[in-house]
Regions:
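Secondary-structure transition motif
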Residues: 2-239
């Protein structure tokens, strides 16, 4: 009996060590690109999942017969570019910044290139997401407002911050109906057509199919290729 009690105490001590380790693990932040409709869906609470194509070393491991998707998704392996439970994602989206353009020499391309000088914060302004912007040409001396692509958004401009609540790796076509709805899809009339008559997939998955292909088919990762994807679950926590 004493040995059993000692075993339980040892197990409890190990559990405490794990909790202390997890509690001490620093929270990391990662940028993630969303288009405007998906950003709006996340802010409204209609989007709580996103799927992204698995690339690089992670994909190489998936091609090994003895390495499962569960292994690739484990925190200990550190493959996820989107973090793990408790980490944060800040959404990069199209935005409007205040600044000017100047030319800088690119040694890589061996020529001058236009470079945007972001002056939004230093001039006491805030980044915008709506409204008109002047149709100015690059090279103007005076700064003004410019619509900027999502890839160039700085962390300071982010208005949507998400906390990761789950990460896994799966085939794209394994998505369930609830997961498709959690992707924030918009179900239209043609997605409903034929469903009651036995259409193969539910409307939410058909809507997700269309959304996915609109973003990824031209890149060679369409629905029909059924790529490995990171399935990331999250909740909105602020900006």
């Amino acid at each position: 009996m004493e040995a059993v009690d000692q075993h339980r105490r040892d197990g409890a001590a190990r559990d405490d060590d794990v909790r202390r380790y997890e509690g001490a693990r620093p929270v990391t932040e990662h940028p993630i690109l969303f288009n405007e409709p998906m950003s709006a869906a996340a802010r409204a609470g209609r989007k709580s999942q996103t799927r992204r194509v698995v690339r690089g070393e992670s994909l190489n491991w998936l091609n090994l017969a003895n390495f499962t998707p569960e292994c690739v998704a484990q925190r200990e392996n550190g493959f996820s570019p989107y973090g793990y439970d408790g980490d944060r994602l800040w959404v990069r989206e199209t935005h409007i910044a205040y600044g000017r353009w100047e030319t800088r020499y690119s040694a890589k391309k061996e020529r001058d290139e236009w470079h945007f000088v972001d002056m939004t914060l230093e001039t006491g302004r805030e980044y915008r997401f709506d409204g008109e912007v002047p149709n100015a040409a690059r090279g103007g001396v005076l700064p003004t407002w410019w619509r900027r692509p999502s890839i160039f958004m700085p962390r300071a401009a982010a208005r949507t911050l998400l906390e990761v609540t789950g990460v896994r790796v799966e085939r794209l076509q394994n998505i369930s109906e609830p997961d498709a709805r959690a992707e924030g899809v918009t179900i239209e009339g043609h997605h409903m057509r034929g469903y009651c008559a036995g259409a193969y997939r539910p409307p939410s998955i058909r809507a997700f199919h269309d959304l996915w292909d609109s973003l990824n088919a031209a890149r060679g990762h369409g629905w029909d290729t059924d790529p490995w994807v990171w399935a990331v679950e999250f909740r909105r926590i602020g900006s």
